[in-house]
Amino acid sequence: MIDENFKKKLAVSRERVEDLFYFENSKEIGRGTYGLVYKAVPKHSNGRFPNKEYALKMIEGQGFSMSACREIALFRELRHPNLICLQRVFLTNEKKVWLLLDYAEHDLWHVIKHHRTAKTKKVPIMVPRNMVKNILFQILSGMHYLHSNWVLHRDLKPANILLMGDGGPDMRGRVKIADLGFSRIFANPLKPMAELDPVVVTFWYRAPELLLGAKHYTKAIDVWAIGCIFAELLTAEPLFFCKEEDIKAQNPYHYDQVKRIFHLLGYPSDTDWPDMKKMPDHQRLLNDARNEGTPIQTFPNSLQRYFDKWKINSQSSPYRLLVKLLTVDPLKRVSCEEAMNDIYFRKMERPPRETDDVFNRYPIPYAKKEQQITIPIDQFQQQQQQQQQQQQQQQQQQQQQQQQQMQQPQIGPPQMMGQPQMGQPQMGQPQMGQPQMGQPQMGQPQMVPSQMGQPPMGGPHPGVVAPDGHAHQMMQQQHQSQHHMQYQQMHDSMQGGMDDGGPQAKMMRMGNVPVGRYGPMGPPYGPQDFHAPQGPPMMQMMPQPGPSGYYQQRPGQPPGPGPQGYMNPQMGMTMGMRPQGVPQQAYMPGRGMPPPQGPNPQQQQQWQQYHR
């Protein structure tokens, strides 16, 4: 037992992180396996901490967890030019653990994203080939050091590969491997690795033996992840992209991910991987493929065809090294040391070194992490709460308006809010028997609907009152459109894109607009009948710019602010294409007809008289 007086003296003398460092706007610059990472600078230049930028990682939870102990112990023992350096450990009186690490301005995730974004904008700027070589060599060098000391990283991915910026000339452009939260010593383990941690490595970088439930695994799982990162550097897209709907599952098996791997590399034969049939989840894989109707056992190797579109020849040295790194049999997979001696690196003018500047002394074109997070976390959370409150208030107002209009008996057709009732025409407003908007007569100028007042999201105008029985349907359509937008933005933000640029690339080619997943895609990527002009030439609608984030009109795309791919079965035309002043549910092309459900026979007769 520790003496209480000693504990009190220790608490008084213990240094607080807040007293030693400035946190720049409390901005989170990263997230590790078990904690958040913040950027900090020393408050006092007294020589204890050099006046430079640091990364402070706060371990989540109370006290020392086993993962935190492992990470701290490994960081204190391991020293290599390509490993992030741990400067100091702080333990606060609130039992919070802080790790003071070297600060890296960039990481491979943002570097690859930068080039992928340029590609989707049809400005193909790929990662320079010499830069790819230097990055790969330094990753292999750092991992060879870990493996030589019997340490598995087990969470290699682009976000955990850091690049030093302009902080110092001796460290500029150096690769640093970070986040040892999943790392383990694999020399003579007391238990199988799979029993200690059943799920390791992010899906896209997970080796096939892990996906098939191997109980024992080796350093080959890190080599596979390096191969996936190498392919992503060459193409700016994840090689084995797959949805991660069960990322928190306790079982490492993932059918879609295994299918994606075998779709590119081919289904292994008994010669390619003799032990595959011994994997615990091999039979489960075959059962899932049989239930899905997928002939997974007949998949050929299509990796060469995949890289042909990136102009990477199958006889080139990078392709040959990639095949060695992505060998499905872990016993035949190349080691980090063997990969460092590959001809791919020997063909350089001078051999690469672990301390080289991967930017080759050129200006760094990538944004820093703190520039990509423009506002503090607390302010961002406040803005999110305000937006949610505003949305709730708008929904409540719309519901109240719709309830009030439903309670009032309607004699004529639904009216726009703020417009005169039937029998009370104003100057400039069409009266009974006069042509409505969008129905010009001979000799009369064409009337173009105003851009203001068009329904957002392709849903009903907030001032339009639906016929009886259709208010619930209008609300449901609006809620569904909002849900699709939110889901599309949340899901596609995680997706790096695959083959033709992925969902993000398609969104940017179409004007940076999320496209509905559950309806046909708009032209030029969908049916051309949606693209046909609506009505005679003199009655076509003018293009509507819509709010920010919607379509920017281009040739070959239909106008209107509504999302493409959603059709109203009662309208027969794309949302946002009806004449102004006529409710969505009541409009049919050619003539205004009542919807098949809703109004009673008396109201239907009044509707027909009104639209004659």
UniProtKB/Swiss-Prot annotation:
<keyword id="KW-0678">Repressor</keyword>
<dbReference type="Pfam" id="PF00069">
    <property type="entry name" value="Pkinase"/>
</dbReference>
<feature type="binding site">
    <location>
        <position position="57"/>
    </location>
    <ligand>
        <name>ATP</name>
    </ligand>
</feature>
<feature type="binding site">
    <location>
        <begin position="29"/>
        <end position="37"/>
    </location>
    <ligand>
        <name>ATP</name>
    </ligand>
</feature>
<feature type="compositionally biased region" description="Low complexity">
    <location>
        <begin position="600"/>
        <end position="612"/>
    </location>
</feature>
<feature type="region of interest" description="Disordered">
    <location>
        <begin position="403"/>
        <end position="483"/>
    </location>
</feature>
<keyword id="KW-0539">Nucleus</keyword>
<keyword id="KW-0547">Nucleotide-binding</keyword>
<keyword id="KW-0808">Transferase</keyword>
<feature type="compositionally biased region" description="Low complexity">
    <location>
        <begin position="564"/>
        <end position="573"/>
    </location>
</feature>
<feature type="region of interest" description="Disordered">
    <location>
        <begin position="543"/>
        <end position="612"/>
    </location>
</feature>
<feature type="domain" description="Protein kinase">
    <location>
        <begin position="23"/>
        <end position="345"/>
    </location>
</feature>
<feature type="active site" description="Proton acceptor">
    <location>
        <position position="155"/>
    </location>
</feature>
<dbReference type="GO" id="GO:0004674">
    <property type="term" value="F:protein serine/threonine kinase activity"/>
</dbReference>
<keyword id="KW-0418">Kinase</keyword>
<dbReference type="GO" id="GO:0000082">
    <property type="term" value="P:G1/S transition of mitotic cell cycle"/>
</dbReference>
<keyword id="KW-0067">ATP-binding</keyword>
<dbReference type="GO" id="GO:0005524">
    <property type="term" value="F:ATP binding"/>
</dbReference>
<dbReference type="InterPro" id="IPR008271">
    <property type="entry name" value="Ser/Thr_kinase_AS"/>
</dbReference>
<dbReference type="GO" id="GO:0005634">
    <property type="term" value="C:nucleus"/>
</dbReference>
<dbReference type="GO" id="GO:0006468">
    <property type="term" value="P:protein phosphorylation"/>
</dbReference>
<dbReference type="GO" id="GO:0008353">
    <property type="term" value="F:RNA polymerase II CTD heptapeptide repeat kinase activity"/>
</dbReference>
<comment type="similarity">
    <text>Belongs to the protein kinase superfamily. CMGC Ser/Thr protein kinase family. CDC2/CDKX subfamily.</text>
</comment>
<keyword id="KW-0805">Transcription regulation</keyword>
<protein>
    <recommendedName>
        <fullName>Cyclin-dependent kinase 8</fullName>
        <ecNumber>2.7.11.22</ecNumber>
        <ecNumber>2.7.11.23</ecNumber>
    </recommendedName>
</protein>
<feature type="compositionally biased region" description="Low complexity">
    <location>
        <begin position="472"/>
        <end position="483"/>
    </location>
</feature>
<comment type="function">
    <text>Component of the Mediator complex, a coactivator involved in regulated gene transcription of nearly all RNA polymerase II-dependent genes. Mediator functions as a bridge to convey information from gene-specific regulatory proteins to the basal RNA polymerase II transcription machinery. Mediator is recruited to promoters by direct interactions with regulatory proteins and serves as a scaffold for the assembly of a functional pre-initiation complex with RNA polymerase II and the general transcription factors.</text>
</comment>
<dbReference type="InterPro" id="IPR017441">
    <property type="entry name" value="Protein_kinase_ATP_BS"/>
</dbReference>
<dbReference type="GO" id="GO:0004693">
    <property type="term" value="F:cyclin-dependent protein serine/threonine kinase activity"/>
</dbReference>
<feature type="compositionally biased region" description="Low complexity">
    <location>
        <begin position="403"/>
        <end position="455"/>
    </location>
</feature>
<dbReference type="InterPro" id="IPR050108">
    <property type="entry name" value="CDK"/>
</dbReference>
<feature type="compositionally biased region" description="Low complexity">
    <location>
        <begin position="543"/>
        <end position="555"/>
    </location>
</feature>
<comment type="subunit">
    <text>Component of the Mediator complex.</text>
</comment>
<dbReference type="InterPro" id="IPR000719">
    <property type="entry name" value="Prot_kinase_dom"/>
</dbReference>
<dbReference type="GO" id="GO:0106310">
    <property type="term" value="F:protein serine kinase activity"/>
</dbReference>
<dbReference type="InterPro" id="IPR011009">
    <property type="entry name" value="Kinase-like_dom_sf"/>
</dbReference>
<keyword id="KW-0010">Activator</keyword>
<keyword id="KW-0804">Transcription</keyword>
<keyword id="KW-0723">Serine/threonine-protein kinase</keyword>
